[in-house]
Curated annotation (Swiss-Prot):
Family in the record: Belongs to the TO family.
Protein name per the record: Circadian clock-controlled protein daywake
PANTHER family: CIRCADIAN CLOCK-CONTROLLED PROTEIN DAYWAKE-RELATED, PROTEIN TAKEOUT-LIKE PROTEIN
Tissue: Epidermis of newly eclosed adults.
UniProt induction comment: Expression is under the control of a thermosensitive enhancer element called dmpi8 that is encoded in an intron of the close-by circadian clock gene per. At lower temperatures, splicing efficiency of dmpi8 is increased resulting in an increase in the expression of dyw.
Record key words, sorted: Biological rhythms, Signal
Protein's organism: Drosophila melanogaster
Gene: dyw
Misc: Named 'daywake' based upon its function in daytime sleep suppression.
Pfam families: JHBP (PF06585)
Superkingdom of source: Eukaryota
Any single GO CC term annotated in Swiss-Prot or TrEMBL for this entry: extracellular space
């Protein structure tokens, strides 16, 4: 399940945010972060982890949005015929992703180079033990022969999310003499152990009908995820593409690492 297109952007955002407050090497990085040597992956991983905790509220002066929560906007989802027993049209509005900054574990980060004559290719391994998407929902569908037409609050809990990320970024030299990066491509491969849906106001909160319906929905998690996952992943990618591009517009890559 490719939910965490978001995750791949966040780590790269975090790493580049080390210099977001002070680009000049003589001024140092905003506490508690520090510049790393190019090949020191353990330092890069440590600083990426620190970033999530230190800047979960974003960096307003750089127009970097908050990491807790992450605004995903509105998603329109329609069942794709994966199950005859469940058919629906679902709108998720004011959607937000929670617990990414609090639970992110960066397991590997490779591909940094000083060669600015060709595209940078990064590979990342990311783990999140638990993520949560919350939104307002509006659904029109059916479960078996039971119609489901409802509005309310939706929560999707995602457990043990493991993501591999590939990012390609093009170095661009500007008139100021510095080189900046522009993302040209990204790919993800994500596995998730399981998930859980919770919807308020089903059948006007008739407890018996609500509980039995949610039980069936959660038993069909894998089927539902085939339709819900791509839309969430698309929303995450859009949100973090904007974050990365706005940040990279002000941060020269050629001043990123500690001098050797």
């Amino acid at each position: 399940m490719q939910l965490t297109g978001a995750s791949m952007f966040l780590v790269w955002v975090g790493l580049l945010s080390w210099v977001s407050c002070r680009v000049d090497a003589s001024e140092g990085f905003p506490s508690p972060l520090k510049r790393c040597k190019l090949q020191d992956e353990s330092c890069l991983l440590a600083q990426a982890q620190t970033f999530f905790q230190a800047f979960k509220n974003g960096i307003p002066e750089r127009q970097v949005a908050a990491l807790e929560p992450i605004a995903l906007g509105t998603m329109f989802i329609e069942s794709g015929g994966h199950s005859e027993s469940i058919k629906f049209k679902l709108t998720m509005s004011d959607a937000k992703l929670y617990n990414l900054a609090n639970s992110m574990m960066v397991k590997s980060l490779k591909g940094f180079t000083k060669d600015l004559t060709r595209p940078l290719k990064l590979t990342l391994l990311l783990d999140n033990p638990e993520l949560e998407v919350r939104a307002k929902y509006d659904v029109d569908g059916k479960l078996l022969i039971l119609p489901i037409v409802s509005k309310g609050d939706l929560t999707i809990r995602l457990n043990d999310v493991h993501t591999k990320v590939w990012i390609t970024a093009e170095p661009v030299k500007r008139s100021d003499g510095h080189t900046y990066l522009n993302i040209t491509d990204y790919k993800t491969a994500t596995k998730i152990k399981g998930g859980h849906f919770d919807l308020s106001n089903l059948f006007n909160d008739n407890k018996e009908l609500r509980d039995s319906t949610l039980k069936v929905l959660n038993q069909e998690w894998s089927t539902l995820a085939l339709d819900v996952q791509p839309k969430i992943n698309e929303a995450c990618a859009k949100a973090f593409s904007a974050i990365v591009q706005s940040l990279w517009a002000n941060i020269p890559y050629d001043e990123f690492f500690e001098k050797e």
